[in-house]
């Protein structure tokens, strides 16, 4: 089954770094996406805030460059996580992260 998502946007919540009891580092943040997409011949505003989690040592170095306001592209897979309040939320598990050059 295919499960791939590529999403670019702006980091809108400060990254939270944790290490699991088994020693695996995790970095969590929220990515806000805004764009104009074409659907059925019409332009529409597309907007979402997607929680992102980066797990493992491979991508942790780049997470130290990520702050609120960073523009990035994330590629990975999506999965549901159940919150402490019992509600489920969709989360993007990052496998590749690329900083978008602001051109400044």
Curated annotation (Swiss-Prot):
The record places domain SSB at 1-101
Gene Ontology cellular component list: primosome complex
User: What's this chain's function?
Assistant: Involved in the restart of stalled replication forks, which reloads the replicative helicase on sites other than the origin of replication; the PriA-PriB pathway is the major replication restart pathway. During primosome assembly it facilitates complex formation between PriA and DnaT on DNA; stabilizes PriA on DNA. Stimulates the DNA unwinding activity of PriA helicase.
Q: Which HAMAP family match?
A: PriB
Please state what the protein is called: Replication restart protein PriB
Which GO terms of the molecular function aspect are on file?
A: single-stranded DNA binding
One of its GO biological process terms is: DNA replication, synthesis of primer
Q: Which UniProt keywords apply?
A: DNA replication, DNA-binding, Primosome
Q: Which family does it belong to?
A: Belongs to the PriB family.
This protein's gene is called: priB
Subunit structure, as described in the record: Homodimer. Interacts with PriA and DnaT. Component of the replication restart primosome. Primosome assembly occurs via a 'hand-off' mechanism. PriA binds to replication forks, subsequently PriB then DnaT bind; DnaT then displaces ssDNA to generate the helicase loading substrate.
């Amino acid at each position: 089954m295919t499960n791939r998502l590529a999403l670019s946007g702006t980091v809108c919540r400060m990254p939270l770094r944790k290490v699991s009891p088994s020693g695996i580092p995790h970095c969590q943040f929220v990515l806000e996406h805004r764009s104009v997409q074409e659907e059925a011949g019409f332009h529409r505003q597309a907007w979402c805030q997607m929680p992102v989690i980066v797990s493992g040592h491979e991508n942790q170095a780049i997470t130290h460059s990520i702050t609120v306001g960073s523009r990035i592209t994330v590629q990975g897979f999506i999965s549901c996580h159940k919150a402490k309040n019992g509600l489920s939320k969709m989360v993007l598990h990052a496998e590749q992260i690329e900083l978008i050059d602001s051109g400044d």
